[in-house]
Amino acid sequence: WAPIFDRYVISKLGRRRGWILITQVLLIFSIIGLGMTNPAMNAANVALLAIFVTFFSASQDIVIDAYRRESLSDNEQVLGASSYVLGYRIGMLSAGAGGLILADLMSYQFVYLIMALVMIGGVLITLIADEPVNFSEPSTFLDAVRNPFVEFFKRHGDSINNNISIPILILLFILLYKVGDTMAHSLSTNFYLEMGYTKTEIGTVVKVFGLMATLVGAFIGGLLSIKIGLYKSLISFGIFQAIATLGFSVLAVSAKSLMLLASVITLENLAAGMGYTAYLAFIANMTNKQFTATQFALMTAIMSLPRTLFSGSSGFLVESLGWENYFIFCSLIAFPAL
C-alpha cells in the first residue's frame, strides 16, 4: 500500500507530514482500543485491533522512512540512519522494559493507555517539523504503482559486460547482505539455552550488552561511514559482521562463561549496529525522492526476506552441521553479497 503515500496528499501539512500525523493518530486510538478490550471476552476484537496496530505501525514506518530520505541529502543519509537506529532501539527498550515494569504496578489497560499517550510526543514533533521539499506526485494511482519500478531499472539500467544487470545486482545485495547475521540470530536463544545458560542470564547479558553494543555500533558506524565513504563501509562492516558471527562457534566449543558470552554478544551486536546503519543509508540512496515511499518499502521488504526464507531452514542445518559448523556457515554465507 506504499504507493498510496506517494500518490495522495490529504493534508495541508504536506505529503509526508500529513500521512505521518494520520497514521500516528490512528495508531494511538488502536493501542487504546486494544488495551480496553478483554481477550477472554472478545478474542475477535483483540485480533482485529492487533491487526490495526500492526497496519498503522507499518504505515507510519513507511512514511517516516520516506520523510527521512527526502529531508536529507545523499551525504547525510548515514547520520540519518544512525540516528534512526539509536532512536528505534531506545524506543524498543523503553516500551519493552518500561511496559513490563508498569505492568507490575497497574493493570495492562493503563499500561496500554500510557504507551498510547506517550505517542502524543511524536504527534507534536510531526506538527512542528518541516515538510521536505516535495516532488510532483504521480498523476494516477497506476503510475504510483508502476513508475517506481520503471524508474529504478532505468536509473540503474546499465549492465556489466552486457551480461549482468546492475539493478538485479543491487537487489541481490540488499537481499543477501544481512543473511548470515539473520540466520545466526534466528536460533540464538535456543543456542544459549542448549549451552547451559539460564533464561535470566540470557535476558540480562543479551539485552543489556546487546543493546548497548548496538547503540555504540550505530554511532560508530555513522561516523566511520562519513570518514571512509559508504561503499567502503559496507564492505568493511560486512567483513566485521562475518568475523563476529564466528564468536558463536567459539561459544559452542567452550565451557560456560558469562564473560565469554558477554564478549561475543558485544562484538556481534557492535558489528550488526555498524552494518545496519550503512545498509539503511545505502537503501535510502538507491531510492528516487519522487517515489521514496514505494521504493523504500519494497527494498526494506527485500531486506526482511531472509528472515522468512532462510530462518525456517536453520533448524535443519543445525541438526545436520551442529552448532559450531552452523555458525561457520552463517559467517561464510555473508561473503557472496560482499
Mark where each language-model region is.
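Helix-to-loop junctions at the C-terminal end of transmembrane segments
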Residues: 1-14, 216-233, 318-319
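C-terminal ends and interior cores of transmembrane alpha-helices
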Residues: 20-40, 239-256
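Symmetry-related core transmembrane helices of the 12-TM Major Facilitator Superfamily/SLC fold
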Residues: 22-28, 110-127, 325-338
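Loop-to-transmembrane helix entry/capping segments in MFS-fold secondary transporters
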Residues: 74-84, 199-200, 289-299
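Glycine-rich segments within core transmembrane alpha-helices of 12-TM secondary carriers
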Residues: 78-103, 300-311
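Juxtamembrane intracellular "pre-TM" segments in multi-pass secondary transporters
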Residues: 131-169
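Short amphipathic helix-loop junctions that connect adjacent transmembrane helices
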Residues: 186-203
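C-terminal transmembrane helical hairpin of 12-TM major facilitator-type secondary transporters
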Residues: 231-279
